[in-house]
Amino acid sequence: MASIPKLVILLLCTCLHTLAHGGDDLRTYKVLHAGALKSATVNCSQPQVTPSSGGVTVPLHHRHGPCSPVPSKKAPTLEEMLRRDELRAAYITRKYSGVKGGAGDVEQSDVTVPTTLGTSLGTLEYLITVGIGSPAMTQTMLIDTGSDVSWVLRQSHEGNSCSGSQCQYMVKYGDGSIGAGTYSSDKLALGSSAVNNFQFGCSQSESGNLLEDQTDGLMGLGGGAQSLATQTAGTFGKAFSYCLPPTSSSPGFLTLGASTSSFIVKTPMLRSSEVPSYYGVRLQAIRVGGRQLSIPASVFSAGSIMDSGTIITRLPATAYSALSSAFKAGMKQYPPAQPMGIFDTCFDFSGQSTINIPTVSLVFSGGAVVDLVSDGIILDSCLAFAANSDDSSLGIIGNVQQRTIEVLYDVGGGSFGFKAGAC
C-alpha cells in the first residue's frame, strides 16, 4: 500500500492572483500557505458571518473535531474515511439505478412505517445539539440529507412512545449494524423554537457499530414525509440551510426557515418520486482557472444530488478526466505524489511555504456558478474529487466541496441557493 503523504493544512490567503504559465496562457490561482497540522488554529466560537435571517439557527460541529460537543474516539484516518465514503456513494448509486438490497433496507411490520434511514453512519461528519421531551433532554445528533427518519438511542430518551406492533421498526446497514425500536413522538427544541409532536424513532436494541462514539442519534434532513424539514414545514416553510466549516477546528450552522430571498445564486432542485429522500441538482459545466472545460453536455445527463453525508464529490468519468488533466496542467511546478485511495491526482508539496492552485468552479443549471474554496479543492495534497466508473452513474456533490458555503435547500420553492463565505 502506498504511504500516505504528510498531511498539510492549506490556509487560504485572502487574495487571488493571476499567474502566467507558458507564454500568454493566463490562469487564475489561489495562493495558499502550507503549514503543519499542529499549527491549525482552533476557534469554536460562532461563525463571524451570520446566517440568513428568518429562521432558527443551531451550531453545527465536526464529529471528530476539537469543537465537537461529545467525546469522540480516535478520528478515523483519511484512508478509512474514503473507504466508508465509497460504500455510501455506491449505495446511493445502486438506489438510483433500481438495484435492491444493501445498506438502508428496512424490515417493516403490518403497517407501513417510513424508515428510510440512509447508509453507514461512519460516513456522517457533522453534529447538531437539540432537546427532545418535556423537560428537554439534550441530544447530539448527526445530520444527513440522505435520510428521512430521525432517531435516538433509547438510553438517551424516554418519551411518549406509541404502542402496538404497527410502530415497531428495524433498520439494517451495509456494515452489518442493526437498529430496532419504536416510532415515537415528543417535543423537539431547536434553539429558541419548539416543535410539538415531532416524530422520530426510539432505538431499543442495537448490534454492530450503530454509533461509534457518544452521539445520541441521527437527524434526517431528507425530502421524505418524515424528515425534519417536512415535519416543520408549517413553522419554517420547508426551507433549511447549512454551512459546513472549512476545517474540523471551527463551527458551522444549520438554519431552519432560512430566508430564501437573500440568496442570489440559485439553481433548480430536481426531485424523483422513486427516491424522494434525495435532492437532485443539474451540474452543467466545470471551470478550472476561470476557464470552462470542454465537456459535452451529455456527459452530465445522469444528473447529480447534493448530499451532506458523502464526503467527496463524484463526477462522471469523462468530466473527472477533464478536470484532473486541467488541474495537473496548472500544477506542473509540483512533483506528482502517489495516489491515495480514490484520489489519483496528488502532489508533493514538500519544502513549499506557499502553494498556487488553480481555482475550481461548479456551474449548475440556470447559470449558477459556485466557486470552491481551497479546502474544497485540495484534501491532503490531492485533488478532492473522484470519478464514477462511467458517465451513466449518478453524480454526487459531496460535503468537502460545500465547505464555507451556506447551501439553501428551498424544498417548497424547488431550488438550491448558495452563499459564499458564510462560515
Regions found by a protein language model. Give the residues of each.
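Short conserved beta-strand and strand-loop elements enriched in small hydrophobics
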Residues: 129-132, 185-193, 241-243, 288, ...
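C-terminal reverse transcriptase regions that engage the nucleic-acid substrate
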Residues: 220-222
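Extended, H/D-rich, highly charged conserved domains that either
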Residues: 236-257
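Aspartic protease catalytic domain
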Residues: 2-68, 135, 143, 202-206, ...
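Flexible, small-/acidic-enriched active-site or ligand-binding loops
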Residues: 251-301
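A short acidic-Thr-Gly-centered motif at the start of a beta-strand
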Residues: 120-137, 234, 283-302, 385-390
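Signature of the N-terminal lobe/flap region of pepsin-like aspartyl proteases
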Residues: 68-82, 87-93, 97-98, 104-198, ...
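Cytochrome P450 catalytic domain signature, combining two hallmark sequence patches
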Residues: 156-165, 238, 264-272, 321-341
